[in-house]
C-alpha cells in the first residue's frame, strides 16, 4: 500500500497552500497536487472598468510584485489603443522594472525564503521567520530594510 505525504502549511509563499504527494508501493511518486487555499478572485474587479484603469487596479493583485502587474497591464493598454510608447517612456519602464526586480527579489529572498537559509531548514518554526533573522543577523536585517526602502523610494520618484 502506498503512502501519502502532506505538507501544510506551505511556507515562504504569498498566501497559503497545501502539497499532497502520493507514493506507490515502491516509494515512487504516483501523484502530486498543490492546493491554493484561497480564491484570489481579482478578475471580477476588472470587468467593466475602463482599460486605462487596469495598471492601477492590477498592482493590487500581488504584494510581492506589483510593478510586474502594472507593467504588464500598461503594455496591454498600449496594445488596446494601438500606441507605441515614446523611447523615453520605454526606458523609464525598463528602469522601473529593474528597480522593482531588485526590490521584489530582496523581499522574496530575505523576508519569505531567507529564514530557511539563515536559520536552517531544520530550525524550529518558532524562530524560522523574518523576526528570527533580525535576532540572528540584525546588521544584515537593517541593511535589507534600508535597500528595500531605497528601491521603493526610487520607484516613487520615477
Identify the function of each model-found stretch.
Residues 1-158:
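Catalytic cofactor-binding cores of redox enzymes
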Amino acid at each position: 500500500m502506498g503512502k501519502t505525504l502532506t505538507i501544510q502549511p506551505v511556507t515562504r509563499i504569498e498566501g497559503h497552500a497545501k502539497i499532497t504527494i502520493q507514493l506507490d508501493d515502491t516509494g515512487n511518486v504516483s501523484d502530486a497536487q498543490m492546493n491554493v487555499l484561497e480564491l484570489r478572485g481579482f478578475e471580477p474587479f476588472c470587468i467593466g472598468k475602463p482599460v486605462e484603469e487596469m495598471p492601477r487596479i492590477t498592482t493590487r493583485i500581488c504584494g510581492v510584485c506589483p510593478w510586474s502587474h502594472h507593467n504588464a497591464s500598461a503594455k496591454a493598454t498600449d496594445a488596446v489603443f494601438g500606441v507605441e510608447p515614446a523611447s523615453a517612456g520605454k526606458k523609464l519602464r525598463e528602469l522601473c522594472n529593474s528597480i522593482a526586480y531588485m526590490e521584489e527579489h530582496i523581499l522574496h529572498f530575505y523576508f519569505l525564503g531567507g529564514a530557511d537559509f539563515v536559520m536552517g531548514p531544520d530550525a524550529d518554526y518558532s524562530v524560522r521567520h523574518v523576526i528570527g533573522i533580525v535576532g540572528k543577523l540584525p546588521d544584515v536585517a537593517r541593511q535589507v530594510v534600508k535597500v528595500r526602502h531605497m528601491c521603493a523610494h526610487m520607484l516613487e520618484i520615477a
